[in-house]
């Protein structure tokens, strides 16, 4: 991705830049997918752009999900920001909007959507039934951290001179 970014400043380096972005995108780099999709859209390669945004969304890029939501809303061809030559599809708009909200709410946790194809596959695939949940969230919620025993808390607190109930220092030091 970094090399592709550097090549964006080199005259006539566009083809190699897109190839670098595509390679990074296929390895799961969300910003590379977004940039690949954006450059493909400018070149009129709408199918490649659509696939790039899908990759970026799967990798956790919320803005790509938002772009797909807007693109499936059927903007006119003169709308250069969101036009991808797609037919209006209200259900896809809603699903991508839900994905955008999910990724935005969990961005600080590094959320991804590995089950994206089972939620909203690219056309011409028919939309499957969806229960409104995300695999990443289900896995995260099921992996509850182990609560340390009171004995361990006492031991560690004593080693550091902390109150085991509050985590604050036992003695206040004067400056």
Question: What annotation goes with each model-predicted range?
Answer:
Residues 5, 21-22, 38, 54:
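Amphipathic alpha-helical repeat scaffolds
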Residues 10-20, 43-52, 88-92:
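Structural signature of tandem alpha-helical TPR/SEL1-like repeats
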Residues 86, 91-141:
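Extracytoplasmic and endomembrane cell-envelope/extracellular-matrix remodeling and assembly machinery
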Residues 50-62, 69-106:
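TPR/TPR-like (Sel1-like) alpha-helical repeat modules
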Residues 1, 7-10, 26-33, 40, ...:
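Short helix-capping/linker turns of helical repeat alpha-solenoids
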Residues 121-175:
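Long C-terminal extensions of eukaryotic subunits of large macromolecular complexes
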Residues 67-73, 117-121:
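Acidic helix/loop microenvironments that form the catalytic cleft of cell-wall polysaccharide enzymes
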């Amino acid at each position: 991705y970094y090399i592709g970014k550097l090549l964006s400043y080199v005259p006539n380096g566009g083809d190699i830049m897109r190839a670098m972005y595509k390679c990074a995108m296929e390895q799961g780099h969300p910003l590379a997918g977004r940039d690949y999709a954006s450059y493909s859209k400018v070149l009129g390669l709408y199918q490649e752009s659509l696939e790039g945004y899908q990759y970026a969304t799967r990798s956790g890029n919320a803005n790509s999900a938002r772009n797909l939501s807007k693109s499936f809303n059927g903007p006119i061809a003169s709308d250069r920001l969101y036009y991808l030559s797609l037919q209006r599809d209200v259900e896809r708009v809603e699903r991508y909007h839900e994905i955008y909200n999910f990724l935005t709410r969990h961005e600080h946790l590094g959320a991804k959507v590995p089950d994206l194809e089972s939620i909203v596959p690219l056309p011409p695939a028919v939309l499957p039934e969806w229960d409104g949940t995300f695999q990443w969230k289900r896995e995260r919620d099921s992996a509850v951290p182990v609560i340390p025993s009171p004995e361990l808390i006492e031991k560690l607190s004593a080693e550091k001179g902390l109150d085991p109930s509050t985590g604050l220092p036992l003695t206040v030091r004067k400056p």
